[in-house]
Amino acid sequence: MIAMTNAPRLIAWELTAGCNLNCVHCRGASTSSVPAGELTTDEAKHFIDEVASIGKPILILSGGEPLTRPDVFEIARYGTDAGLRVVLATNGTLLTPEIVEKLRAAGVQRLSVSIDGANAETHDNFRGMPGAFERTLAGIEVLRKADFPFQINTTVSKRNLEEITKTFELAKELGAVAYHVFFLVPTGRGDESDEVSPADYERILHWFYEMQKESKIQLKATCAPHYFRIMRQQAKKEGIEISVKTHGYEAMTKGCLGGTGFCFVSSVGKVFPCGYLPVLAGNIREQPFREIWENAEVFRKLRDPEELKGKCGICEYKKVCAGCRARAYAATGDYLEEEPYCIYRPGKK
C-alpha cells in the first residue's frame, strides 16, 4: 500500500556544482568550473515560493561549495523570509568573520562543516588539496568566535575508518553541536573500492549506538538506514522502549527518507530522491515542484515498502530501514533491489 504523501521534511539543494576543492569522494564530481545553465536568482526564489506553499522543510543550501555562489546570502534570506529553516553545508575553507555575519543576517540557522579525518594528512587526502585541514579549522574558529552553531559531517570510507573515534573527539573539542556520519555511496567521484566492508559498516553503527547513549552532542548516522534496525535490536536486548525521551528524533523517523521525506535538487533544477541516487523524478524548470513531489514514479515506488525486492522485501525492519536505495542502484541498476551492504538475515532471532 502506498503511503499518503506528506510534505518534504528536508530538501538538499545544490546551489552550485562549482567548488574550490577537489574531493575524492564528491557525489557531484564538482570542480572549480561552474556548469552552464545553473538556476538564476529569480528561478531560485520561485523554487523557494513553491516549496513554502506545500510545507516548511529544512532547506539545506549545498554544493559544490555554496559560498562560491555570489547570491547565496540573498537566496538564504529569501528562504528565511518564506518561513523555511535554512542551513548551509560548507567545506569551511572560505569562512571569514564577514561571511559568517552575512549568513547570520540572512537567517541561516546552522552550518555543517565537513571534516573527514582527525589530522591534516587524512583530511587533505580526501579533499584533494594540501592545507585544506588547516583552512577548515581556521573557518571553524571563526564560527566559534562568532558563537555561530555548527555541526561536523564525516564521510566514512576505508581511508578514515580507523580514525572515526578520533574525528568524533575532535568534533567535540571544536565545539560542534552535532556530529553526523555519512557512509560513502559510490556516486560521482566516490569509488566503490573506498567503501567499507559490510562487517565494518555494522561495527561502526554499533559503536555509534553506544556513543549516542552518553554523548552530550547530537549524533546522527546518514546514508546508514541499517542504524534504525540496529537501534531497535539493541533496545530490545536492553529492555528499553524506543521513544522520543530515550532515542530523540530517531524514534520518530526511519532509515532512508529519499523520496518519502527528503529529496535533492541539482543546480540546474533536476529533482532526485537523494544526491546519490541518479534516478530523475523531474525538473523544476519544466513542472511545479509540488507535482514532482506528489506524482513522480520513483517517489511513489519509494513510498511503498511492498515494492522492495530481495531480502529487503521480506525483512521485518523494512518499514524503518528500507536499505540504501542508492547502494542498491549502484550495485544492480535497480533501486528497489536488496541493500548490498547489509549483513542481516531477515527473520533471524
UniProtKB/Swiss-Prot annotation:
GO biological process, one term: heme biosynthetic process
Domain of life the protein comes from: Archaea
Occurrences of domain Radical SAM core (ranges): 5-214
Stretch forming the signal peptide: none
Record field: catalytic activity: Fe-coproporphyrin III + 2 S-adenosyl-L-methionine = heme b + 2 5'-deoxyadenosine + 2 L-methionine + 2 CO2
GO MF annotation terms: 4 iron, 4 sulfur cluster binding; metal ion binding; oxidoreductase activity
Binding positions for [4Fe-4S] cluster per the UniProt entry: 19, 23, 26
Cofactor: [4Fe-4S] cluster
Known EC number: 1.3.98.6
Similarity comment: Belongs to the radical SAM superfamily.
Protein name, entry field: AdoMet-dependent heme synthase
Gene: ahbD
